[in-house]
Amino acid sequence: IFLNPSDVGGRYAALTFVGLVPAALMGLEFEKLLDYAEEMLETCQPDVPWEYNPAAWLSEYIAERFFLGQDKLTIMADPLLRPYALWIEQLVAESLGKEFTGVIPIVGETPGSPTVYGPDRIFVYLGLRGRQDLYRRLFADLKEAGFPLRPYWLEDRYEIGAECIRWELAVALCGVWLGVNPFDEPDVIFSKKKTKEVLETFKQTGEFPVEFYLDDDLQIGFLYAGGLKVQYPRLRAVVKKFLYETPPWGYFAFLPFLPYDEEIEEIFTDLRTLMRGRRQCSTILGFGPRYLHSTGQLFKGGPRTGRFLIFTRKGRVAEQEIPGWGFTFWDLEFAQAYGDFQALGERERPVLHIHFTENYKEDLRKFYRFMEEITRLSDEEE
């Protein structure tokens, strides 16, 4: 039994038993991770002059640009380090996204030419020495276009231990700059409360308290909330409203509560690239329910610049029941999705809930083609 310190929040627990025990079970040299971490910690002490303090430098880079209106922290990573970038996404979003402010981390986008990025972007690259050629041309193009870019080169992947220290301290210091508490997550509980209410209704009635509109063309269900108003509840009209009312400094968040596989992620990655290319807006992809404890705090507590698209599917007859709870895993997942839809709507965050049939992959492909058409027509109308 490993007893973890109770006063360390999940996103700051990477170098506690939470991260080290799994690393040891995988056969990794966790002592090497800690050696790198200790070296970084020594250089980030309060008595180290600012210009020699790696965490202070990173904090200043993020905060200074934030106050210049560049709040989209775009994190690009060597393919071997991409899972680590997801941890940074949670660290930044959950620590700084509250009280109607926050730095918005953008992770996992397909790299593009400078013309597809808005002026609200700054860039960080996480790379491995010996593999610098992967993004050399992109770096040159971004710098030539005037985008702030800061690369961090790791000697090997064990140096992630040092980077955990750098980022944890830098983000905590950013909280001071932004005037928020980087160690709480006051809005996460709101979605949990809504989910619980949805499940209670389901257990009492056997039905979810939701009735979707049906799009005649695509034959998929949809709901909308968060201040979105259209004369007739048609999916085309709602999506157009999404597009027209999204400011250039806004962002789109695609939030699928769908069975994960590479094909699904690839389609959503294409959707992100499409929206970025047509609207020059930043995009986020968060699979549910994971994102609820990652970027979910930012979505409900951060700046009101996001547009949110939640995706669910119809449950199958033979879904696995959770023993002793009276509902299935699908029921729980749907309640989490609909609960977050309600939470976003009540916080006046424009949100669209798309509900697919059991053939959700084909429905998703149809939805992509629909978005391709609607964004093209919107561009022509403008």
Report each predicted region and the residues it spans.
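Active-site phosphate/pyrophosphate-binding segments
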Residues: 1-124, 129-133, 169-281
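Amphipathic alpha-helical packing elements
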Residues: 271-301
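C-terminal amphipathic alpha-helical interaction region
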Residues: 184, 189, 204-210, 217, ...
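Conserved, well-ordered active-site substructure
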Residues: 289-325
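Ligand-binding clefts of soluble mixed alpha/beta catalytic domains
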Residues: 176-185, 313-323, 327-330, 337, ...
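Phosphate/diphosphate-binding loops
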Residues: 129-146, 150-153
